[in-house]
């Protein structure tokens, strides 16, 4: 191997380099995707392998600009998410199968039906989400319902999540079980805020827009019109293939103590549980305030612990998979239930 590759330590990456350069000494975009695939072959992308990939990106004289940008984005985002000493992992066969779907997507050309979304950024962000769905984030857009549903989908069936997202991008429509998602032109041609992942916009905004009879989800100012009811989420659960789906909702008043028993039972049975709450519950200075409607959707990540002081639980919300409630002092059971407006629970497929 040429001396410019002398610093590369990973046998996997060295082998992939030899294959890529064996024919014409040039790096095609597809060969760079294969390099990423090789690095993920054992399901782990280590800090050392990231350093090796950076050597390739910085020293190759024949790598196309698109491929170099994609590779550097992968390196940058991995370090942003996991730190310089952290590593990205795909721990299950389902996750690795989903990664194969995404690598195939990365090899293709063009912007598909979403001209404002870069294919390679979408693909790399999808890779991160099948390995760690907790990074999903709706940013300022009121699509917490779809994000909560897709968090569950990516956790329970990463293959289904990956296929859904790449089909959306390439075909302008996709299926999740019996859900047919066909977003409007306004949604497909919208440029989301730079602070939001294009993968999250693609998957979540399309789901909400396709099902929204009120407004197109093509403007972050839409707000409440983009939010999802318990009925919407229950329908997604059932049509996606979740079984033993149970739901309860109240538009203007909270639930009652028996619902905590039911939620803990569903959690213990391994069901995916989504809660519709008022977001004031999530902040120390407002958690005990009276509210009159739900305005946010979170995923229950722990049993609801009852103590003499009040309740304690963990939820997924806004890219935080282990968000503790309460954030301030004690949250009484009464105040918790007063901010809980519904739930959906179902067994993963």
Predicted feature descriptions by range:
Residues 1-4, 55, 59-109:
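Low-complexity, glycine/serine/proline-rich disordered segments
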Residues 6-37, 41-48, 54-55, 60-69:
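Acidic, glycine-anchored loop motifs typical of Ca2+
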Residues 19-24, 38-41, 56-63, 77-84, ...:
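Surface-exposed polar/charged interaction patches
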Residues 27, 45, 136-141, 225:
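Extracytoplasmic/periplasmic, Sec-exported soluble proteins
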Residues 31, 49, 140, 145-149, ...:
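Stable alpha-helical elements in mature extracytoplasmic
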Residues 83-219, 244-245, 260-276, 308-311, ...:
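Active-site nucleophile-adjacent alpha helix/oxyanion-hole segment immediately C-terminal to the catalytic cysteine
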Residues 217-257, 261:
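Hydrophobic, aromatic-enriched interface-forming segments
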Residues 243-349:
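Active-site signature of cysteine proteases
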């Amino acid at each position: 191997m040429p001396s410019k590759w002398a610093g590369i330590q990973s046998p996997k990456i060295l082998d992939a380099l030899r294959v890529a350069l064996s024919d014409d000494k040039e790096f095609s975009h597809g060969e760079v995707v294969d390099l990423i695939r090789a690095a993920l072959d054992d399901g782990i992308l280590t800090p050392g392998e990231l350093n090796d990939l950076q050597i390739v990106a910085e020293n190759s004289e024949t790598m196309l600009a698109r491929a170099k940008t994609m590779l550097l984005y992968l390196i940058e985002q991995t370090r942003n998410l996991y730190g310089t000493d952290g590593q990205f992992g795909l721990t299950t066969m389902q996750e690795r199968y989903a990664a194969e779907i995404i690598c195939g997507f990365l090899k293709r050309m063009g912007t598909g039906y979403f001209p404002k979304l870069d294919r390679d950024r979408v693909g790399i962000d999808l890779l991160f989400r099948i390995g760690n769905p907790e990074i999903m984030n709706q940013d300022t857009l009121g699509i917490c319902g779809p994000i909560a549903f897709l968090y569950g989908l990516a956790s329970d069936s990463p293959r289904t999540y990956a296929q859904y997202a790449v089909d959306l991008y390439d075909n302008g429509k996709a299926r999740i079980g019996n859900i047919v998602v066909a977003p409007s032109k306004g949604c497909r041609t919208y440029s989301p805020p730079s602070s939001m992942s294009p993968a999250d916009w693609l998957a979540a905004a399309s789901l909400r827009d396709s099902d929204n009879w009120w407004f197109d989800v093509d403007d972050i100012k839409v707000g409440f019109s983009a939010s999802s009811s318990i009925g919407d989420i229950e329908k997604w659960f059932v049509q996606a293939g979740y079984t033993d789906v149970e739901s309860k909702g109240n538009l203007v008043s909270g639930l009652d103590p028996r619902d905590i028993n039911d939620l803990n039972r569903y959690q213990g049975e391994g069901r995916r549980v989504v809660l519709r709450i008022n977001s004031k519950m999530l902040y120390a200075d407002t958690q005990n305030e009276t509210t009159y409607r739900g305005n946010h959707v979170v995923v229950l990540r722990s049993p609801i612990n009852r103590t003499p002081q009040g309740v304690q639980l963990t939820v997924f919300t806004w890219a935080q998979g282990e968000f503790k409630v309460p954030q301030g002092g004690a949250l009484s059971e009464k105040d918790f239930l007063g901010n809980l407006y519904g739930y959906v629970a179902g067994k993963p497929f």
